[in-house]
Amino acid sequence: MEIRYTPKELTKLPRTVEYKNKSVYMINQRLLPKEFKVEKFSKVEEVAEAIKNMTVRGAPAIGAAAGFGLALYAETSKAKTKEEFLDGFEKAYEILKNTRPTAVNLFWALNRIKKLVEEHSEDPLDEIKRLIVQEAYKIADEDVEANLRMGHYGAEVLPEGNILTHCNAGSLATVHLGTVGSVVRVMHKDGSLKLLWLDETRPVLQGARLSAWEYSYDGLNVKLIADNAAAFVMQQGFVDAIIVGADRIVANGDFANKIGTYMLAVLAREHGIPFFAVAPLSSIDMELKSGKDIPIEERSPEEVLTCGGCRIAPDVPVYNPAFDVTPHKYLTGIITDRGVVWPPFKRNLKKLFEVNKSGGDEAV
């Protein structure tokens, strides 16, 4: 696989999450598409609340945000001793960990930095602080590199034509470029993307508010549909492939993604349409054996009872799962930053991690 484009050649958008001058800066995605605003967060608690209330969302983006939250703690802590600093670090870690339960990148990023701190606990305090900040930057930069690789891998296997996607797995869901976002941007540059169908993605409308905004901003040919129009669009032969993100992929290939993904997978099988998930290795949780083990976040009833701040339903009971789990049998392949994984997923995901540990680069 050859990297043909740089991030700047693929998108005009800035990074979704950044850290500078002892503050975390994030695009406020709750305001889009009405207003584009980068907000400053100067406390760990503020970063945690931004993750919880979906000011920042998307598994890789919240992982990077959490990492920068620990960097923020490291640079603003008033602890006078190493013991006091490490106690405060543990509290900051717990605050950030307890924000959202489904996306594995959050825990991956936090645990990566925590492990580093444990390994260097005998180092001078200033060195521990420096290592925390350095690692947070590495996590963010590696995400951009991974997305760039996934974009080029995905463009090699997806058919030319019309692609349908769900929710927002674009640049806004990551540090930059996106998982799905990188794939469709590379296809757009190559000329192989004819049309990008976007599900509106109720109840928070990430497809309508975020994907439609960011992809049209970068000049892609997009068309928005209601979620319940997807089956008809497939039936009419208007979709050549479906590509979605993944907040957590487990050892057998089952994966959690935005609510409504499972429905699309079943429809894709019925209509003979290739169905791909795109995610970096950091979104793959080999500790969980099947999708039944993935914790599913439930969110506020107000997300369903209201739309754009306006009440659209009476005050009735609501069930509002934020994610669903798609069984691996519906997957054509998993596009990762180390190549494309094909069935059988249980065997080939295991092989992917073995190859990656040995320094290899190609999936199977």
Curated annotation (Swiss-Prot):
Name the catalysed reactions: 5-(methylsulfanyl)-alpha-D-ribose 1-phosphate = 5-(methylsulfanyl)-D-ribulose 1-phosphate
Name the positions where substrate binds: R57, G58, A59, R100, Q206, N257, K258
Coiled coil regions in record:
none
Instruction: Indicate the annotated site residue(s) for Transition state stabilizer.
Output: C167
Q: Which GO terms describe its molecular function?
A: S-methyl-5-thioribose-1-phosphate isomerase activity
Enumerate the Pfam families for this protein: IF-2B
Keyword terms of this UniProt record: Amino-acid biosynthesis, Isomerase, Methionine biosynthesis
Q: Where is the active site?
A: D247 (proton donor)
EC number assigned by the record: 5.3.1.23
User: Which PANTHER family does the annotation name?
Assistant: METHYLTHIORIBOSE-1-PHOSPHATE ISOMERASE
Q: Which family does it belong to?
A: Belongs to the eIF-2B alpha/beta/delta subunits family. MtnA subfamily.
Q: What is this protein called?
A: Putative methylthioribose-1-phosphate isomerase
Source organism (scientific name): Pyrococcus horikoshii (strain ATCC 700860 / DSM 12428 / JCM 9974 / NBRC 100139 / OT-3)
